[in-house]
Amino acid sequence: MEEVQEYLKKDRSPQQHFLYPLLLQEYIYTLAHDDSLNGSIFYEPIEFIGYDNKFSLVLVKRLIIRMYQQNFLIYLVNDSNQNRFGGHSNYFYSHFFYSQMVSKGFSVIVEIPFSLRLVSSSEEKEIPKSQNLGSIHSIFPFLEDKLSHLNNVSDILIPHPIHFEILVQILQCWIQDVPSLHLLRFFLHKYQNLNKTIQSNKTIYVFSKENKRLFWFLYNSYVSECEFLLVFFHKQSCYLRSTSSGAFLERSHFYGKMEHIIIVCCNNFQKTLWPVKDPLIHYVRYQGKAILASRGTHLLMKKWRYYFVNFWQYYFHFWSQPYRMHINSLLNYSFYFMGYLLGVLINPYAVKNQMLENSFLIDTVINKFDTIIPIIPLIGSLSKAKFCTFSGHPISKPIWADLLDFDIIDRFGRICRNLSHYHSGSSKKQSLYRIKYILRLSGGXXLARKHKSTXVPLLQRLGSGLLEEFFTEEXQVLSFFFPKTTLFTLHGSHRERIWSLDIIRINDLVNN
């Protein structure tokens, strides 16, 4: 990144930066090959049509030499389909392989302007760095603190863009390098044409996994545009509760913008959109799923839905389906978010109050944030990963039968520990114990398949060693948070809720 900053400092005008020459630098492809961004708990890297996606500086240098040839990038995109199913001998010399390398390098390059802007912004504002803020589990303590005091919630599925050109137009506001935008069009149209011509579901799945980094960058840019005005209203409304002189200046500027937005809405939508002034609006998003909660009435949530539909319709030129936005009362509704079923439970309490010689009972109600592990989607994910059947019956993992016993146990144990780590915030962990039981029997069945034996005597022979391997992580976490003098069993601690602040990505099984 330091080399990139030195390159961009050569020209002081930020609008004259040309990013495409960075494709000729070897360190760009080294950054793109960083496998730490694409780790998986399954230890199964994605293979492209049966071949290993190897990295070599020799291949990078050969690619850079070819890129100096005239019209190489055009042939690279147009002819990559013809060489996709070539033989193993010419795979590393094919246009398809070079197309993969260029697209991954390009995904690193387009992130540079945003990364530098983020770093400079944090340095100017002197924002302290905190590793805990990067944890996706930090969302749940926020929901636990807020949802129990709110009335209505709207879970939203953000629509997908109907055309790739919308993604390019969004980036035009941030990237002034026209050749780089044209190259992005080449790659987007290549993937679009492939999805139209190839009919195999497995092949389409592999194509969708070719460049996760570029895909998520484009998708996050698109989503940030979808929620831009919502974030603006929410942030500026918070100033209404402030009393500082600087905030008063912000208020007048905010009122001017609100009037301007109302005029624009009247001209474009032919109907007046209600500017939302309620500061008690809470918005949370992860990937394509968003939650909008408020203490206001059901009518207020309908106004927000009307605002979203019209904004998406006139700004992104597509209709939003009604099923993508559900409005419900929190007390009667549970919604799926990031691998949990979230809701609010009503807990009645009787409080005894004594005044002088008279005593009486007061009935009160306390709303409690509830988190449940959905067992059916998790079993479906295990079935999809070939750990069990659709009904939850454990089966062996034949692809792991050739591994060493230690490696098989380590892989199953890693999956169990990751699931326990991610679902440690559940209020009821019986479903998690069932999932771990399925994985334990699946691991035993895989070992029995390797040794050509049955699972029961093999599990009896391994005994507590295999059990300890599968449950040691949860025991360590619980012993860290609770005193050693506290007596509890593993299954008796199912009511303890622990949010981990070191999780930077959602679990693979949960995300399926």
UniProtKB/Swiss-Prot annotation:
Which terms in the GO cellular component ontology are assigned? chloroplast
**One of the Pfam families matching this protein, by short name:** Intron_maturas2
| Entry's transmembrane regions | none
Q: Does the keyword Chloroplast apply?
A: yes
Function per UniProt = Usually encoded in the trnK tRNA gene intron. Probably assists in splicing its own and other chloroplast group II introns.
Q: Does the keyword tRNA processing apply?
A: yes
UniProt-recorded name of the protein = Maturase K
Which UniProt keywords are listed? Chloroplast, mRNA processing, Plastid, RNA-binding, tRNA processing
Among HAMAP family, the record links this protein to: MatK
Renumbered to this chain, the signal peptide range is: none
Superkingdom of origin organism: Eukaryota
Q: Where in the cell is it found?
A: Plastid, Chloroplast
Family to which this protein belongs: Belongs to the intron maturase 2 family. MatK subfamily.
Q: Name one GO biological process term.
A: mRNA processing
- Care to name a GO molecular-function term for this sequence? RNA binding
InterPro entries assigned: Domain_X (IPR024937), Maturase_MatK (IPR002866), Maturase_MatK_N (IPR024942)
